[in-house]
Every structure is written in structure tokens, then in C-alpha cells.
Amino acid sequence: MAEAATGFLEQLKSCIVWSWTYLWTVWFFIVLFLVYILRVPLKINDNLSTVSMFLNTLTPKFYVALTGTSSLISGLILIFEWWYFRKYGTSFIEQVSVSHLRPLLGGVDNNSSNNSNSSNGDSDSNRQSVSECKVWRNPLNLFRGAEYNRYTWVTGREPLTYYDMNLSAQDHQTFFTCDSDHLRPADAIMQKAWRERNPQARISAAHEALEINEIRSRVEVPLIASSTIWEIKLLPKCATAYILLAEEEATTIAEAEKLFKQALKAGDGCYRRSQQLQHHGSQYEAQHRRDTNVLVYIKRRLAMCARRLGRTREAVKMMRDLMKEFPLLSMFNIHENLLEALLELQAYADVQAVLAKYDDISLPKSATICYTAALLKARAVSDKFSPEAASRRGLSTAEMNAVEAIHRAVEFNPHVPKYLLEMKSLILPPEHILKRGDSEAIAYAFFHLAHWKRVEGALNLLHCTWEGTFRMIPYPLEKGHLFYPYPICTETADRELLPSFHEVSVYPKKELPFFILFTAGLCSFTAMLALLTHQFPELMGVFAKAMSDIFCSAEFRDWNCKSIFMRVEDELEIPPAPQSQHFQN
């Protein structure tokens, strides 16, 4: 019985909702008809006359107070709406309307939405996995001591956020530590040092780890697992301690390079020893994996030091050798460092060869790959490109390929052109980036802006064509053209990665909600009414009385604008304009 009553109520509610959704015009006319039929019992005309008399007795001070109060209230609503929109990206009034009024006016029921979500579970999960905002290590990240700290000393601003530095600490613990670190005293100290938040504490721990190795103590190391054969060896140098000092204590790139060379000597020895013992058990295999990460990191940073110090050809050779020696370690994205160095040498044929290997459909893309490919195609036509000539004769095949490459790059990361065209100011790139986000755009433009300027006409071609990308993807959050839809979570992640003094670029740009514009107009209009009422109380009082008479009297159809102004002239006793003699005759 109860179930039948509940079902009847649900059916009745659905019928009412349906009627409000599709038959609202019929309901509106029914209400008007009822008001017309009941106008005599309800004494509508008498009530309107009473209201009109009451309004006629009001003084101008009342209207000043009324308009001033309404202006103040609408201004407070505007301030609250603007704050809510800047913080949460949506209008509070619209959100409340959608959450509470939409179900009453025929919105989607929660059960039906859950059913639809469950039926499309596979597609939704695939889309979530694709659009998940994964943070990547910046392959071109700067040195903390020699570059980031110097910026802080000069400007007093912190270029790195706590979230970014915390991610770096997690990377260091992942790449530079293993479960057997407690067996070596220096590595045990460094394992704690990577967890330290205070930079001075980390540096002190690194010095302590190096001092332990200065003691010529001896340790017994098994030559073969589960064997009775032992060899006496000196404790090896701690490579990770040199890495920390080179990254955070060195104040110049030259000092960092010296420390990295010492780290290379220590890390190479550890790598060779662990390479011989890697098949003797899981513990040795973990040590070898850690020593491999340490060695690759040191060699990559040495190549970056050479690039910073102007030895670009030496840096290119070191990167090529590193990629040949460890071809499977793609997590460091060394090819992006190589592309930047080759562009500095203007070795465009070598750049094209690297792109042919890494710009593959099965490999993850980056702004470096997409925009470098666009730069190479733009280089072939940019020196002779003219928008006026192109509009007259049309685009040639080479120009069309260049424009398509630019559109492809802009679709992948739409934030880069503003930095390349210097429409937004650059800051130091963070240690981690979000692909397709503002952080990746900053990291790319910081190093590659000079390469675009070096190619004659490339920035002009980019300026003329990059905005055409948005016509092909009118709804980038729902459907892309060459890539997956643009992820929604980039703005939130970029705000965590980038410092607070930087204005984060948002795509697609959010438009102001209707209610913010409405409250702004309402506030301005009521403030203007309050000012006019205060300055001209008699005139505004006459207008208010005339308007109340128009809308409240039963004979409002006979009124027009002429009668309003005639009444204003009578109330204020404005004399008629003098007429000329010719007009009187």
C-alpha cells in the first residue's frame, strides 16, 4: 500500500514537472485569466488606487533612501559574486539555481544520471585516464643554487612553490634511494637528507655524508652472493651527496660543474660495481637501478652545465652519447635537451632527424616537439610570407603545411604563443610542468624564444595564424581536432606549480556569468537613480508619481509619453516657450 502511494506521488510529481517544463505558457495564461475573473472579488482596482495614493504621499527623501539601499545591496552581491567566481570559477547564484531549481523545473534525476554514467563507464574511464593531469619533471629545469636562489637574492621573490619543491623531493627519493641504503652509512644519511624541508639541513647532511667517506675505514663486501669469499674494499664516495651540493649549494654554474664531475667519478664506480652484481638477487638489482638513475642524472646535468657555459657542441655530444648508452631511459626526456642545443647550433637537419624519431603517434607529445616541428616548417616560408599576398593568391602547399603545423602546436598547448609573441611576461620555469598547461608554456618559451626570433618572419607567421586554431575547436573541453579534448584540471594544477605573483593563463577563457553582469548593471542603475534623486528631488518625485499613476490606474492604456511630460510641466509650472511673430500669424 505504501509502495503504491509512493509511486502515485512520484507519478504526480513527474506530471507536474512535465507540465512546468513544456506547458509553462499555458500555465501563464491560466493565471492571467484567473486574475481577470477575480478582479472584482479581490478588489484589485481599489488596491491599486490605494497603492497609488500611498506612493503620491512619499517624499523625495524616501526615494533617495530606497535607491541608495538597493544600490548598496546590489553592490555587495556583485562583490560576493566576483569573489566566488574568481575562487571557484562559477557563479554562486547560477550554481544554487542549477542545484535546487533545476530538479523542480524538469532537471535530470540523480538515478537516471547514475544509470547513464554506469552504462557509459568504459568510455568515461578512458577519457579520465587520457585527460588526467599528470605532472612531469621539467627536462630543462634550472639549478637551485646557481639560478633559482640568485633570483631570490635579487628580487626577494620565491620562484618555486612548496608543491613544486615537494614533488622534487619525492623524485629524489625515488631515483636516488633504495631499500639497501641502510647498509652504507653515507647513503643512509642522504636518504634522510632528501626528506628534509630546510635547505641548510640538506646541505649539512650532504657534507656529513662526504666526511664519513674521508675516514679510511674498511668494509667487507661479498664477491659472490652466498659465498665465503670476501674482499676488503674502501668505502666509495657518495655520489648523491655531490649531486645535492651541486644543485643547492653551488652559486655558479662553474662550481656546480666541478661538483658534478666529482659526482660522476663516484657514481661511475658505484655503477660498475652494481652492474657486476645485479643478477645476484633483488637487493643488488635495486642497487643497480638506483646507481643507473644517479649516473644518468649526473651526465645529463653535466651536459646542461656545458650548454649553460657556452660549450654547446660538447653538450650535444654528451647528450648523444647518453642516449646511445641508455636508450630505454626516456623518463628524463633527454631528447628535449638535445633539441634545444641543436637549435642553438642552427643544425636544423639534425633537429629534423631527432623529431622524426620522437614525433611519433605512439609517443607522448610535448610543447617542445610540437612547436619545434612548427618552427622548422615555418622556417621554409616565413621569410617571404605576407598576409596581404596570401589573401590575394591563397596559400601555397608549403605555407599550408606551416600553418597546419602551427595549428597543431597551438591545439596541443594554446598558452605558448602569448609568451613567444611577448604578450605575457616570462618568469623562471618551475621544476615540474603540466603538459598542455601554462607551466609547460613558460618552460618552453623561456629557452626557445631566442630560436624563434632567430628565424626571420617566424614570429610574424605565428602572429597571423595562431588564433585560427580556435575556429576548428569551438568546444575544446568536449572535442579536440588532432588531440584529445583539453583537460579541465590544468588551471588548478598550474596554480599549484607556479608562484603567486604570476597570472596563470586559463584556456578556454572563462566568460563572466550572467548574474555578475546583471548585478553590476543593477548596482550602476540604482546608484544613478540615487544620485539623480538626491540632486533633483522634485523632478524625480514627479517622474515617480507619474510612473506610479501609469502602472497603477485602471486607465493606463490612454496614457502616453506626451501626458507624462505635460504633467511634469504642470507640476513644476514651466512657462511655455515664446513663439515668434511669424509663427503667431
From Swiss-Prot:
Pfam families: ST7
Transmembrane segments: 15-35, 62-82, 512-532
Glycosylated residues in this chain: N47
GO CC terms of this entry: membrane
Cellular localization per UniProt: Membrane
Modified residues (Phosphoserine): S386
InterPro entries hit by this protein: ST7
Keyword terms of this UniProt record: Glycoprotein, Membrane, Phosphoprotein, Transmembrane, Transmembrane helix
Disulfide-linked positions: none
Membrane topology per record: Multi-pass membrane protein
Family: Belongs to the ST7 family.
Name of the protein in question: Suppressor of tumorigenicity 7 protein
